[in-house]
A protein has these predicted regions:
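Short glycine-/small-residue motifs
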Residues: 101, 161-162
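A short, aliphatic-rich beta-strand micro-motif
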Residues: 147-154
Length: 196
């Protein structure tokens, strides 16, 4: 997979694999070492689940597996409910990308990468609740909105993503209702992933 340059088309996406010139051998236990440059670029950390499948051309393909992505239909609906009840734009993300949004232009945020500051926050399993004079955190790369409330989605002891309510022009601080909504949503998605 990593050694050749090939255009692959599927019904969902068209993408081009770049030639990296890296060839790896499988050891006697069936392990393959993924080079550090690729792990860094693709944000593959120790413990990151990878989906392995083969193509008809004889390729072995590794793809990052997102448990949050498995429940994206529910995530869309839940984001809509959170927006209607909480009155603030809402996004739900896995550890890398936004997978659901409501109250904000979906084209603006869907599939965008999460910021390194959000990555660090959810990696530490911390929640964020902004006060009127609190620190501003931009959770999505390239989007000029700040997190008002953020809670990590945890399932089976692993952090899988986050539920985030974003600031808009009228709302800059979080109240108890918003905290409860975000925490309940994060717990709900954690339970959903444990049951899948």
């Amino acid at each position: 997979m990593f050694a050749g340059s090939k255009t692959v088309s599927s019904e969902r996406n068209d993408y081009i694999m770049k030639a990296t010139g890296i060839v790896r051998r499988i050891d006697d236990l069936g392990r393959v070492v993924i080079p550090k440059e690729i792990r860094r670029t693709m944000r593959i950390r120790e413990g990151t689940p990878l989906e392995i499948y083969t193509s008809v051309d004889g390729e072995v393909i590794f793809r990052k597996y997102s448990p949050v992505g498995e429940i994206s239909g529910t995530a869309d609906q839940y984001a809509d409910v959170l927006y209607k009840v909480g009155g603030m734009p809402t996004v739900i993300c896995d550890r890398d990308h936004v997978i659901a949004a409501s109250g904000i232009q979906k084209k603006e945020v869907l599939e965008r990468r999460v910021s390194s500051s959000l990555e660090d926050l959810i990696e530490q399993r911390k929640s964020l609740y902004r006060t009127a004079d609190g620190i501003k955190m931009n959770p999505i790369e390239g989007v000029d909105r700040f997190a008002v409330a953020c809670a990590p989605i945890m399932a089976d002891g692993d952090v899988n993503g986050a539920v985030i309510m974003l600031s808009d022009k009228e709302n800059s601080a979080v109240d108890d209702k918003t905290k409860a909504l975000v925490e309940a949503a994060a717990m709900y998605f954690g339970k959903q992933m444990e049951d899948v």
